[in-house]
Amino acid sequence: MAVYRKKISPIKPTEAVDYKDIDLLRKFITEQGKILPKRSTGLTSKQQKKLTKAIKQARILSLLPFLNKD
């Protein structure tokens, strides 16, 4: 029987997710510019929703690209 361990959230529950913190947001985006899913990041549902909104807001304000064209 396999034992599964709960992933520890990389963002502390007290830490605020802000659209201006580009370095933090880039950790949760793939090379193509897609937002990583909750199951691979280890975030809680609340944190994932806040992160998604922050990434989308940063994209609209041109702080992050919609697509990475490399």
Swiss-Prot record:
Domain of life: Eukaryota
Coiled coil recorded as keyword: no
Gene Ontology terms describing biological process: translation
Presence of the UniProt keyword Cytoplasm in the record: no
Localization terms from the record: Plastid, Chloroplast
Keywords: Chloroplast, Plastid, Ribonucleoprotein, Ribosomal protein, RNA-binding, rRNA-binding
A GO-annotated cellular component: chloroplast
Main subcellular localisation: plastid
Single GO MF annotation: structural constituent of ribosome
InterPro entries: Ribosomal_bS18, Ribosomal_bS18_CS, Ribosomal_bS18_sf
PROSITE patterns: RIBOSOMAL_S18 (PS00057)
Gene3D superfamilies listed in its UniProt record: Ribosomal protein S18
Quaternary structure and partners: Part of the 30S ribosomal subunit.
NCBIfam families: S18
Family to which the UniProt record says this protein belongs: Belongs to the bacterial ribosomal protein bS18 family.
Protein name (Swiss-Prot/TrEMBL): Small ribosomal subunit protein bS18c
Naturally occurring in which organism (per UniProt): Porphyra purpurea (Red seaweed)
Gene field: rps18
